[in-house]
């Protein structure tokens, strides 16, 4: 089968296995207000749709979520693993820059959803432009420590986390996510970069 480029076209040809991939994917999008800058939310939306299409074409279970916070954490389920109504991509078009971002609660929710999948390889992609900034003092070192703890907890449970940093807050995101940090300086390369990571994981699985 063919893998995709950032514009949705094929970026290289590679024969991929036709049987079950034993991989499940979840994407968590930051929908904080700062995502309106430099069309970040547009690129995040595009990357989510392209990855969604690619996974569906290979029968890889995928779920896509967004999150923000305005007093309470708001989570948006754009595509669920078992979604059958055919409207996932229409829902993803509603992805928007909104308010704050209390990342810990959202990340834990999506990780728990991913844990319900039977596939042994579980990948969670986070697309964000900055460090957490929520109400009730959820920011700075305390929030960073919370996220590092959540990352470590779910990696022990078998989830591999990647954080695509698409804003100016890259050092902080790298400090939080460590080896899962992905530096996206060119927003147009976001879909391609995430796609290549997914392809590498597929190839790694079948080379084992």
PLM segments and residue spans:
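Acidic, glycine-rich A-domain
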Residues: 1-208
């Amino acid at each position: 089968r063919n893998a995709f480029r950032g514009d949705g076209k094929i970026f290289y040809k590679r024969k991929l296995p036709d049987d079950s991939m034993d991989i499940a994917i979840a994407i968590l999008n930051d929908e904080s207000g700062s995502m309106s800058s430099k069309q970040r939310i547009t690129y995040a939306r595009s990357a989510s749709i392209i990855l969604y299409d690619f996974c569906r074409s290979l029968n890889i279970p995928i779920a896509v979520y967004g999150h923000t916070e305005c007093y309470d954490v708001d989570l948006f389920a754009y595509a669920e693993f078992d979604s059958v109504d055919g409207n996932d991509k229409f829902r993803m078009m509603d992805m928007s820059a909104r308010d704050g971002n209390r990342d810990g609660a959202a990340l834990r929710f999506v990780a728990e959803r991913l844990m319900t999948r039977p596939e042994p390889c579980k990948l969670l992609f986070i697309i964000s432009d900055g460090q957490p900034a929520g109400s009730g003092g959820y920011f700075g070192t305390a929030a960073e420590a919370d996220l590092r703890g959540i990352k470590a907890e779910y990696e022990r449970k078998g989830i591999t986390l990647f954080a695509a940093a698409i804003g100016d807050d890259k050092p902080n995101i790298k400090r939080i996510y460590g080896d899962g940090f992905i530096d996206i300086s060119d927003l147009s390369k976001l879909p391609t970069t995430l796609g290549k990571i997914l392809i590498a994981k597929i190839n790694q699985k079948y080379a084992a």
